[in-house]
Amino acid sequence: MEDFIYYNGKKYRKGYTTGTCAAAAAKACVEMIENQEEVSAVKVTTTGGTILEIPVAYQQFSEKKATAAVQKDGGDDIDATHGMWIFVDVELTDSPEVTLDGGVGIGRATQKGISVEVGEAAINPAPRKNILATVRESLGENRGATILVYAPEGEERAKRTMNSNLGIIGGISILGTTGIVTPMSDEGWKKSLSMELEMKRNQGLDQIILVPGNYGDDFVQNTLGFASDNIVSMSNFVGYMLKETQRLAFKKVLMVGHFGKLVKVSAGIFTTYSKDADARAEILVANLALLGAPLSLLQEVEKCNTTEAAGELIEAAGFTQVYEVIAQKIKARSERFLKFTKPSVEIDVVTFSTERGLLAATKDIEVLREEWR
């Protein structure tokens, strides 16, 4: 696919989704049955309305059945499914109905709360509609077919995705809101985080623990001893996920994370990528100064590359109260961020250090344990 975007001055090639792959393979199958000859490429309209010519990597056909495969091309966005083959079988039937299912390597939903019903193949609504429409257009109104999408590498590749967190077991999902993969875009990632949050809400939870990643997850379960059922990753998208908790009407949010990540939120930085915003040292220096720390400590902390290194200096100088001050500021900033939209969300914060463990919490830990057990 020769379409590009520019990001930070660099040129990146776009790609196409697993949903577009499946639609293209399905169309190739119908064309092979119709014409009784192999098809090297097909033109498909993506879910977003873009017309693409997609190469077909594998072809096999008989009078009423065909198999085709399309290799997933994520462009310069090398995700978990990039390069894998998405296979489709299409078989003509005597019924006018067109049906779609997933086979080997396509995950199955095992929990309520996502856009796929429990027991169904993990083919999301937009690509499902697109695949069915593509086949229907090729067949006409009076003929029917069964469509089976499968991916021999799917179960292994799914280990690199968030599917297990969403209760999708046994393989990958067939995805694609627009059908196009845009490199350097966070939208797909954010959508998957939202899906997990929606699933928790649909299961009846009204309070949630947001963690930046695995460190936070481990700390919640292994140090604090809280249940894992309430945990959802927010990655670097703190502001986005806070807004999502409000949209979904969660009553309480507990943010638990490494101090080096959450300290940024105390200064109003709600997307915590280091490439976008850092300011860890500056935030620490400013808060230490307000506590009356000596200039020599401020100068040494300002030189530190990590909050772990700064922590040694802060502890030695007896200014560990700075962590409590900053934790309260994280809470205040987060609640202010949601202030002008209803419903209100109660937010608490726990921060920790890899070396020193628990640093600060906006409530007594035992009170939090009682609330979140």
From Swiss-Prot:
SUPFAM superfamilies linked: CbiD-like
GO biological process: anaerobic cobalamin biosynthetic process; methylation
The enzyme's E.C. designation: 2.1.1.195
Disulfide bonds: none
Superkingdom classification of source: Bacteria
Reaction equation(s) it catalyzes: Co-precorrin-5B + S-adenosyl-L-methionine = Co-precorrin-6A + S-adenosyl-L-homocysteine
InterPro entries found in the cross-reference section: CbiD, CbiD_sf
Keywords assigned: Cobalamin biosynthesis, Methyltransferase, S-adenosyl-L-methionine, Transferase
Alphabetized GO MF terms: cobalt-precorrin-5B C1-methyltransferase activity
Biological or metabolic pathway of the protein: Cofactor biosynthesis; adenosylcobalamin biosynthesis; cob(II)yrinate a,c-diamide from sirohydrochlorin (anaerobic route): step 6/10
Similarity-based family: Belongs to the CbiD family.
Protein name in the entry: Cobalt-precorrin-5B C(1)-methyltransferase
